[in-house]
A protein has these predicted regions:
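Membrane-proximal intracellular helices of multi-pass ion channels
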Residues: 1-488
Length: 488
């Protein structure tokens, strides 16, 4: 294993985190808050460690998927550990476990919180908490590829390890250009949302932090009641942008280059929009009688469907009080998730499409055993290797989910709480149902359960395997052998 390039990547990530921590420091100056000193200290620490790790450039800059997965998993763990230190130093979240949970939830764009009173945080910490969503939304390593030349053609292994979904690839021949293009679209949509929210008389600070949460599909609000206290206009702006950030970014690339027919013909995007429309209609009629008006019913149903399927986690109402049918739809949407190549979480719409087509193919083979039928996506045949990897992904997901529910259930909480808590964390949604509903939090869980859910959040964001590979005996053996060689 090429440990020198892994070390260099980790150092680059630390330097990036240190640089990004300058923003909450600026916020602390604007609001005259002393919490900024803690962020400055951690930022300088990140930069110092980062420079130490990158001082000696690796001679061998070529690495493969194995190194890409290890680099990605370790980068996200390290990013979260250093990112949580300011919360502890400011004593706004004094417990390291709680601070780490909150930070992992931020970077993985989950939005599950342990805080009872979000509004008690300083503006500095509120900003950093929301900013972690924006950093993690498109992926920290994708950002790194956009600004730092790492290792030539091998960069694809970093993007492959971090990118959400089974069909994310290069938009243009040069990977660096792809990364920059992705962030250009990401940044552009974020700025447009901020402007539209400010036009709706939302305070500038609120507009920026809300847009961070929407863009990264994270859902950390700066109000205890999330988005429910804002105007109807703001609710609809957030709804629309949640849906937009849940779309495969390849579609925006095609639109930018005026390939409208190809963009609107994308099978996954069409399925994604159909699922949203059907879900909104079903929930609307289900909650109409209990709503104060039809306008509120359609607003709440559209907002919550968009929030859950994109795994954002904002809320405008306590959907814990909705009828069972509506809550069931929301739980199903948690697992479906957004499109591949978006900032959303969940299993991804494309995986379900291929799985359903695979099921249809197997059924047809029983009826017509001599006919060879290929699975197609957007009119193109899907390689057998892709279908196989999706089947393995589903099996792995089920195993991790089942084990996690069993471990969390040791606390003796009700089944709905345990099931949806794990579903909300592994799918990077945020709120669940019952005791982890939208107006509740995860603070009541034990340290064991919190660490289980931290693992789930990281596994869900990294598409399971980059994190799991750290526990592979061969990788552990290589890591320890590298340590022994370095001592010698």
């Amino acid at each position: 294993m090429n440990s020198s390039i892994i070390r260099y990547i980790l150092g680059s990530v630390l330097k990036l985190e240190g640089a990004l921590m300058a923003l909450p420091c600026i916020v602390s100056v604007i609001y005259k808050e002393e919490e900024g000193l803690s962020y400055l200290a951690v930022a300088l620490g990140c930069l110092a460690f980062g420079f130490l790790l990158t001082f000696k450039k690796p001679k061998d800059t070529v690495f493969y998927l194995k190194e890409g997965c290890v680099s990605t998993a370790l980068s996200w763990i390290m990013l979260s550990i250093f990112g949580c230190i300011p919360f502890v130093l400011t004593k706004e979240i004094p417990s390291f476990t709680n601070a780490l949970f909150e930070t992992i939830s931020g970077f993985t764009t989950t939005g599950a919180t342990i805080l009872d009173d979000v509004e008690s945080l300083s503006h500095t910490s509120m900003f950093w908490r929301s900013f972690t969503h924006w950093i993690g939304g498109m992926g920290v390593l994708v950002f790194l590829l956009a600004v730092v030349p790492l290792s030539g053609g091998s960069n694809v292994n970093l993007m492959r390890a971090e990118s959400p979904g089974p069909s994310f690839g290069k938009l243009v021949p040069k990977l660096k250009t792809t990364a920059r293009l992705l962030y250009l679209i990401y940044f552009g949509l974020t700025i447009i949302q901020i402007i539209l929210l400010i036009c709706g008389r939302m305070p500038v600070f609120d507009a920026i932090t809300t847009s961070f949460g929407t863009a990264g599909t994270g859902g950390f609000g700066i109000k205890n009641n999330s988005i429910s206290g804002y105007s109807l206009y703001i609710k609809w702006v957030v709804t629309i942008f949640m849906i937009l950030f849940g779309v495969n970014f390849n579609a925006y690339y095609l639109i930018l280059y005026k390939k409208f027919k190809s963009a609107f013909a994308m099978e996954e995007v069409k399925a994604y929009l159909i699922i949203i429309i059907v879900s909104v209609v079903c929930i609307f009629f289900n909650i109409l009688k209990m709503s104060t008006s039809a306008v509120n019913a359609i607003t709440d149903s559209a907002f919550q469907v968009a929030s859950i399927i994109t795994t954002t986690g904002f809320f405008t109402t306590d959907f814990n009080l909705w009828p069972e049918a509506s809550k069931t739809i929301l739980v199903i949407l948690m697992f479906i998730g957004a499109c591949a190549g978006s900032t959303g979480g969940g299993i991804k719409v494309s995986r379900f499409i291929i799985l359903i087509k695979s099921l249809g193919k197997e059924t047809d083979s029983y009826i017509h055993p001599k006919i060879i039928k290929k699975i197609k996506m957007d009119g193109k045949p899907v390689e057998h290797e892709v279908v196989r990897s999706i089947n393995v992904y589903f099996l792995t997901f089920i195993i991790i989910f089942t084990v996690s529910v069993l471990l969390v259930s040791l606390e003796n909480k009700d089944f709905t709480t345990n099931f949806t808590a794990v579903a909300a964390t592994i799918n990077n949604v945020g709120p669940g149902l019952s005791k982890v509903g939208p107006i509740c939090n995860f603070g009541g869980f034990s340290a064991l359960s919190k660490y289980v859910m931290m693992f789930d959040m990281l596994a869900g964001r990294l598409e399971l395997f980059p994190l799991l590979i750290l526990f592979h005996p061969a990788i552990i053996k290589e890591i320890f052998s590298v340590k022994r060689k370095s001592r010698v």
